[in-house]
């Protein structure tokens, strides 16, 4: 499925979810208000979602003078990937992580945390940056930032549903299909989960491709594999202050590794990603299935490299 179609499907699904919440909160009038709100959010998501996410994490832009080493790495990678130079931001958090955002490669942004720069070596930083530039190259960034903005709006509406339940609902008794307090409570629980499932469906498959493309850009799969190991370890030791609606845009999920979060994880298992980078398989074993998956991974990486030229 092309990313244009994926974006359209995402916007339609998120809009439908908002309308359901609006209908539960205020009947037909609530549904129409939600539709208008969704239209505004769709417009804002396309033009301003990157700014919203950067503001959310208090990211600051760097220049070649203020962070020469980081700027030089990105500059080298974009030349290899045949991409325009993105704007680069640093997030004031100690947990190592990164994300890319923007509506297209000409308006792309790459953001890294202070922890990434402090805790990873140059090869690992290069691997992470190559992974994020792969998302830019594969045009994943628009759909990712739109999903983040829309999921945030849905979670806000779900919170309104929860308050509506607390105060006994907001609809009059003569509206068709009057919603109950129990319905509002259920909606306040289900809506955020539905938003996470949509995020998961959008982003999970793209992470493997970004890993393969990133390895092709950097020319060093081990750099990214080692970085993923460290990011996974440090994310547990130094929890990140992250909004769940933006979890899918990061290199690794910044959310706590609880069973529920793993169930609704927006990323594939780290072990699987690392094994694919190192061995071309999910297990790293030398059996026939592993050999087949290794050939598939090599084919995927070669295709990614062909797209760079």
Curated annotation (Swiss-Prot):
What are the annotated disulfide bridges?
none
Residue ranges crossing the lipid bilayer per the database entry: 7-27, 29-49, 141-161, 182-202
Q: Where is this region: Disordered?
A: 278-309
Q: What is the lineage of its organism?
A: Bacteria, Pseudomonadati, Thermodesulfobacteriota, Desulfobacteria, Desulfobacterales
- List the molecular function annotations (GO) for this entry: metalloendopeptidase activity; zinc ion binding
Please list which residues make up the signal peptide: none
Q: How does it sit in the membrane?
A: Multi-pass membrane protein
HAMAP family according to UniProt: Pept_M48_protease_HtpX
Its family?
Answer: Belongs to the peptidase M48B family.
Location comes to:
Cell inner membrane
Per the record, its GO cellular-component terms are: plasma membrane
Q: Active site annotated at which positions?
A: 132
Q: Which residues bind Zn(2+)?
A: 131, 135, 207
User: Which protein is depicted?
Assistant: Protease HtpX homolog
Q: How is the cofactor bound?
A: Binds 1 zinc ion per subunit.
Q: Which CDD domains match?
A: M48B_HtpX_like
Origin species? Desulforapulum autotrophicum (strain ATCC 43914 / DSM 3382 / VKM B-1955 / HRM2)
Database matches in Pfam families: Peptidase_M48
